[in-house]
Design a protein with these regions (language model features):
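Anionic ligand-binding catalytic core segments
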Residues: 1-68, 72-73, 77-168
Length: 168
């Protein structure tokens, strides 16, 4: 599943991704409370399902390159089969309104960036996560790919987001 967004007046909001599916959304908060530690979250998810743990790595990597400062345990979760209780996937990525453009242009340099440091330290200290992340073989985005995505954003962006993302 992919989160879909729509304009709501002057705002962008996430469409309800549970409406047309047969699964319940369960926030990570229900499993780990307010513990936002990447390693603790990854280890718990990995103990349940390694494929979903890989999706979690992609989620926090995306947060890192897009400066999403609002990834707490109520802002991501799982789709659960209500009949069996099985967790079937990570919920679509949602609630990204704090990322990149919400607070104006981002400052550079990135060598002191807390998000990059948190992600790097997490991978350095969690060997399972590090090996899994390597196996994902995530390729860098090109400026053209980023600009193509930006063309689909229905708001005016007053500075070069592509350069900011590429600098990270």
């Amino acid at each position: 599943l992919t989160a879909e967004y729509e304009m709501d007046g002057g705002y962008i909001r996430t469409k309800d991704f549970k409406e047309s599916v047969k699964y319940n959304h369960e926030p990570m908060f229900s499993l780990i409370d307010e513990d936002e530690d990447y390693s603790n979250n990854f280890n718990l998810i990995h103990s349940m399902n390694s494929s979903i743990a890989a999706d979690y790595l992609k989620l926090i990597y995306t947060d890192t390159i897009c400066c999403n400062t609002d990834r707490h345990t109520d802002n991501y979760g799982f789709l659960r089969n209500p009949d069996t209780g099985e967790i079937v996937s990570l919920s679509p990525n949602y609630d990204n309104n704090i990322a990149l453009i919400s607070n104006g242009p981002l400052g550079l340099p990135n060598e002191n960036d807390a998000f990059i440091e948190l992600f790097v330290v997490f991978l350095k200290n969690n060997i399972t996560a590090k090996e899994m992340f390597k196996s994902l073989n995530i390729q860098p985005l090109s400026k053209q790919e980023i600009e193509e995505c930006i063309q689909h954003v229905p708001i005016k962006i007053g500075y070069d987001i592509a350069d900011i993302i590429l600098s990270r």
